[in-house]
From Swiss-Prot:
Keywords: Cell membrane, Disulfide bond, G-protein coupled receptor, Glycoprotein, Membrane, Olfaction, Receptor, Sensory transduction, Transducer, Transmembrane, Transmembrane helix
Glycosylation sites: N6, N184
Listed InterPro entries: GPCR_Rhodpsn, GPCR_Rhodpsn_7TM, Olfact_rcpt, OR51/52/56-like
Name of the protein: Olfactory receptor 56A4
Chain ranges on the Extracellular side, renumbered to this chain: 1-28, 79-102, 164-199, 262-276
Cystine crosslinks: C100-C192
Compartments (UniProt record): Cell membrane
Organismal lineage: Eukaryota, Metazoa, Chordata, Craniata, Vertebrata
Organism: Homo sapiens (Human)
Cytoplasmic topological intervals: 50-57, 124-142, 221-240, 298-313
Record keyword Transmembrane helix present: yes
SUPFAM superfamilies assigned to the protein according to its UniProt record, in alphabetical order: Family A G protein-coupled receptor-like
Amino acid sequence: MASPSNDSTAPVSEFLLICFPNFQSWQHWLSLPLSLLFLLAMGANTTLLITIQLEASLHQPLYYLLSLLSLLDIVLCLTVIPKVLAIFWFDLRSISFPACFLQMFIMNSFLTMESCTFMVMAYDRYVAICHPLRYPSIITDQFVARAVVFVIARNAFVSLPVPMLSARLRYCAGNIIKNCICSNLSVSKLSCDDITFNQLYQFVAGWTLLGSDLILIVISYSFILKVVLRIKAEGAVAKALSTCGSHFILILFFSTVLLVLVITNLARKRIPPDVPILLNILHHLIPPALNPIVYGVRTKEIKQGIQNLLKRL
C-alpha cells in the first residue's frame, strides 16, 4: 500500500481510501454481510436481465424498464463494492487519480439515472392502474425509448459537471480520503482551492433532481392509492397495497438516503464520519439486492419466465 502524501507541492497521482476511521477493527466483520448482499444483488439482477432477454412474453415496456433498472444496479455494484471489499480483505486502499474520478462519474451518473428510472416506472404503474384502457396506447416501446433517452440526457446534463468540478481543483491537503469511495465532497475537501461552488452545485442539483423525482413518485402513488381503495373485490385491495406499498417503500429508501447523504456530506463536522460512509455503502447494496425481488420475483410473469428458463437448461 502506498504511503500517505503530505507534500503540498507534489501533484496527487493517487488517493488512499480510509474506510470507517473510527471503527477500523470492525471492517473484517462487516465484509461478510456486505459480500452476501453483493452476491445476492449481482445474482438476482443478472437472472432478471437474462430472463427478460430470453423470454419473449416479457418483451413489454414494463419489463424493458426493469431491465434498465437491473443494468444500472449491476454497474453501480461493480463500481463500488469490489473496491470496498478489497480494502476490507486485503488492505488495498490506493486508487489512482483517474480511477477515482471515473468511479465518481459512474456513481453520480447511474444514481441519477436510477432515480429517474424509478420515476418513469411509477408513471407506468399510474397509467396501468388509473387508466388501464389507455395503457397500451400510452406506454409503448416508443415511450420506453424516449424515456431512456431522457434518462441519459438528463444525467449527462446534470451529473457530468460533478467529477469535472472536482478534477479541476488543485490537491495539496494530502491524499487520504476518509471514505470507502470517491465521493465528490470527500475528494474535493482535500483541495487547497475554494470548494464552495462544488458544495453548492451538489446540494442544489441533488435536491432539485432527487426531490422532483420523489415528488412525482409520491403524486403517482397517491393517485394509485386512491384508485386501489375503490376496489370492491375481496382481497384485491390488500394485494394491490402489498405490491405498490413495497415498491413505494423501496423507492422512498433510495431517494431519502441520497438526500440524507447530500446533507451529511455538507454537515460532516456535526455528524460522526462513519455514518455517511456506512449509508453510502448500504445505498449501493440494499436497493440493488431488493429491486429484483420487489419488482421482479414477486411478479407472476417474471416467476413464470424464470421457470421456463430453468426448464430449458
